[in-house]
Amino acid sequence: MASGSRTKHSHHSSSQAQSSGTSNVNYKDSISKAIAQYTADARLHAVFEQSGESGKFFDYSQSVKTTTQSVPERQITAYLTKIQRGGHIQPFGCMIAVDEASFRVIAYSENACEMLSLTPQSVPSLEKCEILTIGTDVRTLFTPSSSVLLERAFGAREITLLNPIWIHSKNSGKPFYAILHRVDVGIVIDLEPARTEDPALSIAGAVQSQKLAVRAISHLQSLPGGDIKLLCDTVVESVRELTGYDRVMVYKFHEDEHGEVVAESKRSDLEPYIGLHYPATDIPQASRFLFKQNRVRMIVDCHATPVRVTQDESLMQPLCLVGSTLRAPHGCHAQYMANMGSIASLTLAVIINGNDEEAVGGGRNSMRLWGLVVGHHTSVRSIPFPLRYACEFLMQAFGLQLNMELQLASQLSEKHVLRTQTLLCDMLLRDSPPGIVTQSPSIMDLVKCDGAALYYQGKYYPLGVTPTEAQIKDIVEWLLAYHGDSTGLSTDSLPDAGYPGAASLGDAVCGMAVAYITSKDFLFWFRSHTAKEIKWGGAKHHPEDKDDGQRMHPRSSFKAFLEVVKSRSSPWENAEMDAIHSLQLILRDSFKDAEASNSKAIVHAHLGEMELQGIDELSSVAREMVRLIETATAPIFAVDVEGRINGWNAKVAELTGVSVEEAMGKSLVHDLVYKESQETAEKLLYNALRGEEDKNVEIKLRTFGAEQLEKAVFVVVNACASKDYTNNIVGVCFVGQDVTGEKVVMDKFINIQGDYKAIVHSPNPLIPPIFASDENTCCSEWNTAMEKLTGWSRGEIVGKMLVGEIFGSCCRLKGPDAMTKFMIVLHNAIGGQDTDKFPFSFFDRNGKYVQALLTANKRVNMEGDTIGAFCFIQIASPELQQALRVQRQQEKKCYSQMKELAYICQEIKSPLNGIRFTNSLLEATNLTENQKQYLETSAACERQMSKIIRDIDLENIEDGSLTLEKEDFFLGSVIDAVVSQVMLLLREKGVQLIRDIPEEIKTLTVHGDQVRIQQVLADFLLNMVRYAPSPDGWVEIQLRPSMMPISDGVTVVHIELRIICPGEGLPPELVQDMFHSSRWVTQEGLGLSMCRKMLKLMNGEIQYIRESERCYFLIILDLPMTRKGPKSVG
């Protein structure tokens, strides 16, 4: 179907069962599938070639049956050589290969002499030695100016970025697009006839093509997010509008390597191909590799006879044509095109970022071929190289947009999976295991399937389309017999997986994924055969098409695909297997924990490890950050959640004339910025406090003092949300750069004030690097600061193309995506749409990486007509770059901590359920009174821990919206639970605990949130024990209750609780964190601060009192007294 298509059937590459595992296993599996497909491709190619040599018709149906046969290694090598070094080109252009050092011709196409008018017949006066042959100096074939251009191109580092080069034949004067690329033995020059003889028109045409691509890109970027179908529909319309092909389609490659037409724009009278699925071998792996190397492929006329390439006999192997725009199509593909009535085609590769394993190698290896955008035409069609180049830019933008949409879809899917897993685990532990099948959500909601089942303790719980109980028992016996040492199994074909009873299941159950929970308990997911889900919107088979099963045609491709997937389900995707594997691990751990008795010890060990991990690193990062802020030569300031200054470094104080002391507490918006910047500053704050961090925003700061009167300071800032340990936003930090000098110059420059040349070429350090473009994106200005920044002189740069030639070849960019973005910015500016502070990075002449901000404005003449663009570059100071690096390091560490915390909160639930279950078993036994009290204390601690990890949202505590869960409880039970939490620490430190608590407290029943009160008191007591003198020290708990009757016969218990220790007590910074700081310094301080706020929510209060020889917490709390006792524990 698409360019590079060959024969039309693939033996399914995942026929054997695969064990469920991680994405790394899945990646290796995908590689093995691709390698296996190479064999199938080579076999089909050999069958096609043999049929041609023997004069027999290539029987499509018979070829389908032979793809499973093995292929000798030499046959695969021959096949790959044929694909990559076929020795023929298309006749719409000619090709010359040259030795790079000597310019000597080493190969040429047989039509080159005629096309370049070099034959003696066409030029009778031509000397024989000038006729093109092996060894000819290629420069003698073209005009002197053309030769100079070729010499310059040969010296370029990235030669392809200079394409196309406009050159003329020496003898005829005919113009050509020269498209150059390097191969292993030299440089290949593809020559395509140009349609105009004016080079200026050629450049203008190229720019016009780019403008059309930019317009299409802008349309793509304006689409609403979350709709990949709309994105694909839009891109086919844009490509068809750009190129004029009769039909344009988007092909998507699925994980099992087969393809599908997911979008189509066509002439109304053509048969639709939307919805067509085709076998993996329709586009062989070798062709897919070529698309990653050469992302645009044009076939002008499939009926045209390919032209042979003649080469130097000293070359060891045929010339590599992988990167050639003229490479001839393979015979089977040309035949396929002819059969479907498509004479010409254009194929554009859609490249997106690969997965983590693919990205290890970096560069092109980190990119993945997602699919193709293909244009078909019913007559001969050729589009010039500049337009094809513009289409390539459009594909890069489409790939970027698609990548973002795929990442968003993946994140939403992952959230759904995590939520479903959590609900299933909770359901399993709260109820009975069959609940994950019988209730909602069920295990069918985890992955796409037609049925699912649980086999638990010999009982069968089916849901949806599933085998019968007798059949599932047979499957379980087969699994234990042949896959007993595995942790799971997945297959899209039970017959191919070797299950002997597959025939009895029919088409209803073809694919199966199974997860072993224990050696006797299993989870199953089932899928029916694929064909029932796939429909093609194309025309029905016509009775007159008698050879339809044998001819290579889209309809026969679809038929072949249905044959391939017969008795198969859709394959289990990597993400689906990861979800199943994750649920399996969680359930296995849950089953074990419910049976184990030492779960509590595991929880404590895990929590202890979590508490210590990473603290030293975070402290180090925090100290480094503070030092950088204080000493930086970049202006840095910070505000709290109300927008008031709480950080103000020396540089911003110097710029504004406002000292640190004067700035503290002032409103950034109302006191420190100009009126015209107030809206911008308010938006910055609003977004940052919601977690959206704006970058490169310009604000105008006021200045104070006699010397600063009526001056303004312009700073470009990045807004960074300041977060506490639990990821709550507590303020905003602004890391800025002073651009006042550049701003003044730029304003004068744009308004054509002052002496133009004096401004541009001034060596004054306040003059920023400036370059300019004419209407055709050629460089027309390159100032002194730009020379210093890049290492390239004005004379070397002016007149060259900014996109590709300057930024691309001279100043290398990081990949084609960066060039696409730069091209869009430049064309937008020429079109009147200014771009401000665009992140722009490149390598200078010496290979140093330069990170900058690019501002592009339209350039007008005295009459107001647009004549190009001005571009200004701002460079971040070293201090700012270091500050940003440290900020990213801190964010990464905080994110890592958050992930670990989320993991702990999730994983700790199962051991806690195990403790709860153990407690419930103990309650049913004969216990002494003391044992009952211990059990009650254990249950109280377990409830406290469950509530902490369930309600971890500190923001609700901060703003006073935490929901309290009130109940009746014994006050004595709370005290016992609180004391139990410090007993181990007391023993370790050798500290004595003194309890001065009235006996009646034990049976006093009150009403309130027992778990929160217990949490608060335990934290205060724990911190006092931590800082008590050791050894031989002591801590005293002194409780004084009093009864206060109020209206309606209700009595309130007024509690005064003192926690006392001798000596100095808590460190001052801990007390500071507890009472005053919104940006805590210590973990203990955060805990005490949260507990103080929780106590306040319960209408209580806390004081910390330091006396000469002792210190103590004084906790005051009023709780309503109740007459009935609390419900039984458990």
From Swiss-Prot:
The gene is PHYB. CDD domains: HATPase_Phy-like (cd16932), HisKA (cd00082), PAS (cd00130). One of its GO terms (biological process) is detection of visible light. Residues 621-692, 755-826 form the PAS domain. Residues 1-12 have a biased composition (Basic residues). Keywords: Chromophore, Photoreceptor protein, Receptor, Repeat, Sensory transduction, Transcription, Transcription regulation. The keyword Transcription regulation applies. This is Phytochrome B. GO terms for molecular function: phosphorelay sensor kinase activity; photoreceptor activity; protein homodimerization activity. Contains one covalently linked phytochromobilin chromophore. The keyword Repeat applies.
